[in-house]
Amino acid sequence: SMLELTPDFIKEFAVFLSTDRGLQNGSIWTNCMWLKGVVMRAHFNGLIPRNPFAQFHISPNIKEREYLTEDELKTLMTHEFADSKLSYIRDIFVFASFTALSFVDIKELTTDDIVEVNGEKWIISKRHKTKIPFQVKLLDIPLQIIKRYEPYQTDKSVFPNLNYWSICKPLKKMIKECGITKAISFHCSRHGFATLA
């Protein structure tokens, strides 16, 4: 019963998750926070006299998100892929690295969003998620990538046929083929932007 939940039991539960179940710290934290929510509600409703989680603390120990260094990005940019799909995914990833755009913002990017201001090309649009306006100056590399896919543009879409789930697995293959051992997701491209900016 809930009355048997003590601070010692909770500590033993965390040890059990680690040793017997082989869970990492983040997963242990998730399981403990779920149990803590149930226990706190029971305590709040008067079902148990005290909160056994009051003195218990575990950190999620969340790692910093990985990103490609400038050298790794150069390796990716210059690698010759036999598979044209990997080349396309690489170009989208590199584009995101230089513009800090999210996948969905790149997917929704149209030729109308690219404008010339004082002789320079800019992306002027709104973030899909927040609807907040933004502007990004297009440097040489993103401009070259846009130009490369101009022949394939349909319905003003700058990068046609983009689907997030269809690039996840090939992205990992692409990174591995370049000899990069980091666990890289598409979102990591935006974190790399800070090192390039």
Label every model-predicted segment.
Residues 139-181:
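Active-site/catalytic core of tyrosine-dependent DNA strand-transfer enzymes
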Residues 23-33, 44-103, 152:
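Basic, Lys/Arg- and aromatic-enriched nucleic-acid-binding interface segment
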Residues 17, 95-96, 196-197:
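Short alpha-helical segment immediately N-terminal to, or the first helix within
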Residues 1-40, 45, 84-85, 162-165, ...:
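N-terminal core-binding DNA-recognition domain of tyrosine site-specific recombinases/integrases
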Residues 7, 31, 73, 88-90, ...:
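Short, leucine-enriched amphipathic alpha-helices that occur as contiguous helical runs
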Residues 57, 63-66, 72, 99, ...:
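Conserved tyrosine-mediated DNA breakage-rejoining catalytic core shared by Y-recombinases
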Residues 120-126, 158, 185, 196-197:
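Short functional hotspots where side chains directly engage DNA or cofactors
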Residues 105-108, 183-185, 194:
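Active-site-proximal segment of tyrosine recombinases
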